[in-house]
C-alpha cells in the first residue's frame, strides 16, 4: 500500500497589514498608509502569499479589509491572535501606535514585523510599549533622514532604520469638483493645505497670516479643517484680512487638485513634518513650493529650483519670496515644471515600491 506524501512545510509567510486608519479624509498619514497597504497587497499577489488588512476606521483599504472603527483594543487583539495561531505570518504596521501590541508578546511568539516612523509620534519621549515595539522591530522604516535625526535622542536604536521617501502616483482624483467654490476663488492665489489642530500648531498657518499684510494684493486659500480653524479665522480677521483669506474646510480630492491647478504656489512653512506629502501634491500639479528651512522639506524641495526654503519666523524673507512668485508668473511656471520633473524622478510610486520590495521580501521569506 502506498503511503501518501505529506505536504511540504510552507516556507513563505503571509502578510497581515495593521493600520491606524486609511480613510480618505485622514490626511497625509492615512495616505502614506494606503501607499504601504497597496504595495503589500501587490507584492503578496505576485508572490502568491496571503495578505490580510486589519484597520481602524471604515474605509480606504486597497483590498477587502476588516475594519474596527474606533476600537483600538479590538484591533490589537486581532493582531495578537494572528500571531498566536499556527499560521506563519509577518506584520506590516502603518504607525507605531498599533505596533504597541508587539511589546506584550514574548520573543518566540512575536512574528517578524515592520514599523514606519513618520515624525512627531517619535520626536518625544516614548512610553515603554512604543520603545519596545521599535527596539524589537524586524524592519524600522523612516520616511526621511530628518525624522531619524529628530527621533534618535529618544530611541538610539534607530541607527539601523531604513530611509525611504514617500511617493505619489499619477492618477485621476476621486470625487466631484466643487465648481461653485473654485469659480468663486478664481486663480492666482497662494495655497496652504493641512489639518488645523490646536495641539499641532506647527504647519505655519500663523506665520503665513501674519506675513500676508506685507504682500499687497496677495490672496490666501486655507484648505483643511480641525479644532484650531476658528482661532485662525479670528486671527485673520484681527489682521484685517477679510476678503483676502478663504477657509475652505475639507474638500474632495478632485476639488483639491483643481485648487492646486488654479494656485500660484503652495506655501506651508512647517517645522513639524516628517516629510510633507503636500509638497509632492504641489509638485505633481506643477506648482512651486515655499517651505521652511531646517525641516524635512529640505529633502523634498530643491531651494531655488522647485521653490524656496525660508526662515518661517522672518516675515520679511517670507513676504519677499511670496511677492516674487506672485509678480513673476514665468518664474512660478519654471519652478513648477522643475518640481514636476523632480517628483517623477525622485518620488514616483515605482521608486517607492522598488525601495520597499526587498524589505518586505525579508519579512515574508521570499528571495528575489
Predicted regions and their residues:
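Conserved donor-binding/catalytic core segment of Leloir-type glycosyltransferases
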Residues: 16-18, 181-213
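A short, well-ordered alpha-helix in the C-terminal region of glycosyltransferases
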Residues: 317, 324, 331-346, 352
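Conserved acidic donor-binding segment of nucleotide-sugar-dependent glycosyltransferases
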Residues: 303-304, 308-315, 324-329
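Aromatic "clamp/platform" in nucleotide-sugar-dependent glycosyltransferases that forms part
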Residues: 271
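Short alpha-helical donor nucleotide-sugar binding micro-motif in glycosyltransferases
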Residues: 250-251, 258-263
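Short hydrophobic beta-strand element within catalytic cores of glycosyltransferases
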Residues: 288-291, 301
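Short His-centered aromatic/hydrophobic patch
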Residues: 93-99
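Nucleotide-activated donor-binding/catalytic signature segment of Leloir-type glycosyltransferases, i.e.
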Residues: 230-251
